Amino acid sequence: MKKLLTVMTMAVLTAGTLLLPAQSVTPAAHAVQISNSERELPFKAKHAYSTISQLSEAIGPRIAGTAAEKKSALLIASSMRKLKLDVKVQRFNIPDRLEGTLSSAGRDILLQAASGSAPTEEQGLTAPLYNAGLGYQKDFTADAKGKIALISRGDLTYYEKAKNAEAAGAKAVIIYNNKESLVPMTPNLSGNKVGIPVVGIKKEDGEALTQQKEATLKLKAFTNQTSQNIIGIKKPKNIKHPDIVYVTAHYDSVPFSPGANDNGSGTSVMLEMARVLKSVPSDKEIRFIAFGAEELGLLGSSHYVDHLSEKELKRSEVNFNLDMVGTSWEKASELYVNTLDGQSNYVWESSRTAAEKIGFDSLSLTQGGSSDHVPFHEAGIDSANFIWGDPETEEVEPWYHTPEDSIEHISKERLQQAGDLVTAAVYEAVKKEKKPKTIKKQMKAKASDIFEDIK
């Protein structure tokens, strides 16, 4: 769960008035002003919204290692090439895993498979349900044989519950949560293996199953799969070894979810930022990266950072990561700059400066991980994740990791605000400073400043 711990809240000084962070979102009044000449960075939310539609509606759930994830990667790479970026594809292996479906009485139920459990036969398993309470040995009778054991979380470890069910002759195990949650629980077998399928589901779904007679479970093993990172590079002119600024977002989703906000929104805002920033003069290299397999444990970003050379690491300056920046949930009224340690860094400072320039007053510094900024931080690179959240409950949205994470719950106003702010923040980090090229010019410039002061 992407939760937020508020550490610092920003106050903006405008015309001598102290403005506290707003608890509601208002549309941006103008495009971002990025220089004294008031040249504009025209971030367009409608472009990002269109890309979200392609990812979440035309393609749909983008589970790591699947054809849908690869189709998304092709779309992203094509978009980057149209922007004349130098595009590279970095492939990597992902761990073997189980995925599947569960249904009962004509209703599909979201599940998470336990690592270390067995798959079902290809056709799946349809069997009567056996209510095994908390899964103690005494909870199983001879009647459990050949059935699917339905067990509540609590008291015993998941492995103990599963082994007791297997010993009693159960064909599979469904463990349901004992507390409310937005997503199904994942039973942790602590590195052990069992010979029957084991899955976890939400509390409400488990309680509903106690009233049903049978269920159908299909669990398939996925092995030898790969995912890919898509990297689009904008290089500065006439600079051999520039510092590197990273703008990143993951494009995969969890099973069943169209992933409109998580994270079609971050990917789409990143691509629109690339369009806006491609022609901006800069003395730094910008790498726009769409990471694969984030939902499996930050696999894409970890692989990328692990394979940076020593020279690249020394040149790496900062990482701006975008994850869930388009929600329409009214309560998610604060845009958080989420650092792993909760401390101010280059991302926060450039974001705060950008917010002051564009008049954005709903920005807070927070502590937290669970996204692709983490590997950069661990490598010593200043990094942060941008995400909308509710300052009261720390929740991001009620549709997180569910089939309801669809384009109907995307706000163009939130996309515009996040896009304006992060684009301006990245510009603060990469803009080309005008500096005298020679000592003579530098002395002349200083003399001119003095003359201006005494006129």
Curated annotation (Swiss-Prot):
Functional pH dependence: Optimum pH is 8-9.
GO BP field: proteolysis
Gene3D superfamilies membership: 3.50.30.30, Zn peptidases
Temperature optimum or stability note: Stable for 20 minutes at temperatures of up to 80 degrees Celsius.
GO molecular function: aminopeptidase activity; metal ion binding; metalloexopeptidase activity
Pfam families: PA (PF02225), Peptidase_M28 (PF04389)
Annotated keywords: Aminopeptidase, Hydrolase, Metal-binding, Metalloprotease, Protease, Secreted, Signal, Zinc
Family membership: Belongs to the peptidase M28 family. M28B subfamily.
Role summary: Catalyzes the hydrolysis of a range of N-terminal amino acids.
Record protein name field: Aminopeptidase YwaD
Gene: ywaD
